[in-house]
Regions:
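Generic detector of leucine side chains in alpha-helical contexts
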Residues: 4, 10, 26, 30, ...
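Intrinsically disordered, low-complexity boundary segments flanking structured domains
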Residues: 31-36, 109-115, 164-165, 171-174
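Long, largely alpha-helical accessory region at the distal end of helicase-like NTP-driven motors
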Residues: 131-190
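Conserved helicase/translocase motor-coupling segment
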Residues: 1-37
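Detector for Asparagine
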Residues: 32-34, 41, 129, 167, ...
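Short coil/turn helix-boundary motifs
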Residues: 6-7, 66, 181
Length: 190
């Protein structure tokens, strides 16, 4: 949500979750964090999984070039293969992926470029450190990271997080929590 708020809240996003239950919990969390967008359209965020009849009914709208909603789809397996998600600009990995084939299929959801429709790139947000398992520099080329990207830099002056609108506030350094897979963990609610 923070990334979408700092870039484009209407960019098509797929969140890959560990299970259908996880996809439902993620959908609820994203609805809570994006309640203003959900008020505009209740289908801003939907779960699209094999057992979700309502979500599956929204699949054609999600993959459509001309339909703005749904914007965020949470899923476990259904969107991994076979869905031509033409306008997906953000792929979020919140599940462990151990198969190179599955990984490439998931990433493939974002690779469709449609310059005439405004789709020139896509972003992978990896919360499980999956991308390091499938690093193939000979095939993929060097990893591009925007070193100039500053989280929250587009927030309005005098925002709720302090700072002057140009520079982030002087927050005390937090000691990161690292899980067994080496991923940094951020607790957002206790």
């Amino acid at each position: 949500t923070e990334y979408l708020k700092s870039t484009d809240r209407m960019q098509k996003t797929i969140v890959f979750c560990a299970s259908e239950d996880h996809a439902e919990r993620m959908r609820i969390a994203l609805i809570n964090y994006n309640s203003d967008m959900v008020k505009e359209n209740p289908d801003y965020c939907v779960r699209i999984t094999g057992s979700d009849v309502y979500g599956k009914s929204k699949l054609d709208y999600f993959i459509s070039v001309s339909e703005p909603y749904p914007v965020i789809a949470t899923t476990s397996e259904l969107l991994s293969t076979g869905a031509d998600c033409k306008m997906t600009k953000l792929i979020v990995l919140d599940k462990t992926v151990e198969s190179m084939t599955t990984f490439k299929q998931i990433i493939g959801r974002g690779t469709r470029i449609r310059e005439k429709d405004g789709k020139t790139h896509f972003v992978v947000m990896d919360f499980r450190n999956v991308t390091r398992l499938f690093s193939d520099p000979d095939w993929d080329g060097p990893i591009e990271q925007d070193e100039g990207f500053r989280h929250g830099a587009s927030k309005p002056k005098g925002g709720s997080h302090g700072g002057d609108g140009k520079n982030p506030p002087d927050d005390p350094a937090e000691t990161p929590i690292v899980d067994r897979a080496g991923c940094k963990v951020k607790i957002i609610n206790k």
